[in-house]
Amino acid sequence: MKITGRDALIVVDVQNDFCPGGALPVPDGDAVIPVIHAIAGRFEHILLTQDWHPPGHCSFASSHPGRKPFDLDPVSGERLWPDHCVRGTHGAEIHAALQLPRAELILRKGFRQEIDSYSAFFENDRTTPNGLAAYGRERGLQRFFFAGLAYDFCVGFSALDARRSGFEAVVIRDACRGIDTDGSVAAMEAQLARAGVPLVDSRDL
C-alpha cells in the first residue's frame, strides 16, 4: 500500500489510563506502541488524540448515583466508564513510551462536561465537531490511517466519522487493541465493513 503526502497517521488515545495499570486498561494496550513506532516513519503527517475529561464528567459511572462502570446510561444509552483520563492527571498523559517527535497535532476530546467524545471528528452528540475534518481539509489530506486505543470505541468511531466527513479511512488492525464489552469488537467490525473501511496489517504498509 503506497503512502503519500496526502495521508496521515492518527494515533488514538495511547494514554496511561488505557494501558496496563491504568484506570480503564485496554488488554495489552501498550502492545500497540512498538507497532506504531515501526510504521510512523512512513507518514509525513502524524496526529495524536488525547481523551481529556473534566472531573465529574458525564461518562463516568461515579457521576450517576446507583450506576456502575460498564452499565448503560438509561437516558443516553451510552456506556458508563470508570473515572479516567481526568485532565491534568498522570492517567491522562500520553504514555511515556510513545515517542513520536514529528507529531504535528495533539487533539483533545471529551473535555465538555455534558458530552462524551469517542470520535476525533465529532462529539457523541454527532453534531459538535472536534476539528479534525477542518484540519485535514486545510492541509489537503485525503486518507487517514488509524491506530491506538480502543479499537472498538475511539479508533473505530473515528474511522467511521472520517468516512462520514468525506475522507478515506484505513484501520491498522495490529496497531490497535480493543476492550470488547458485550461483543463490541464484532459490532464495530460490522460497522466498519458497511462503511467501506478496510482493516490492514502494519506489514502491508
What are these regions (language model features)?
Residues 2-9:
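Extreme N-terminal starter segment of soluble prokaryotic enzymes
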Residues 6, 43, 102-103, 166, ...:
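Short, well-ordered alpha-helix to beta-strand connector turns
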Residues 12, 50, 173:
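Active-site flanking residues adjacent to catalytic metal/cofactor-binding acidic residues
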Residues 22-28, 120-124:
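Short glycine-enriched, charge-decorated loop/helix-capping segments at active-site entrances
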Residues 34-143:
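Active-site alpha/beta core segments
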Residues 36-39, 153-166:
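Histidine-anchored nucleotide/phosphate-binding helix
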Residues 170-185:
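Short, flexible loop segments at boundaries between secondary-structure elements
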Residues 198-205:
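Short acidic-hydrophobic, aromatic-tinged amphipathic segments that line or gate anion-handling sites
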